[in-house]
Amino acid sequence: MNKYESVVIVNPNLEEESIKNLVKKFSDLINTDGKVTSVEEMGKRKLAYEIKKLKEGFYIVIKFEAKPELIAELERNYRITDEVMKFMVVKEEE
């Protein structure tokens, strides 16, 4: 299994409970075929440019181990989740 890091920017207007539910949803998806090693909620940050007419975003960093096939499914879930504004998944160097 490879090590990955995923940065997800979600709508900053969400309630804390909604953000926790999103983190749980993505963590559960990763844990089906991999293992989450850490989740860090970095909080609201100013964006470099407006996304969906918003100047701030709530940043979440998820580090995990998974098979490469899981990444496509994870990215598909990010795309169809309305609350997700931007995301990025990168493979960590060994």
Map each language-model feature to its residues:
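Structured, basic alpha/beta domains of bacterial-type, RNA-associated proteins
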Residues: 2-94
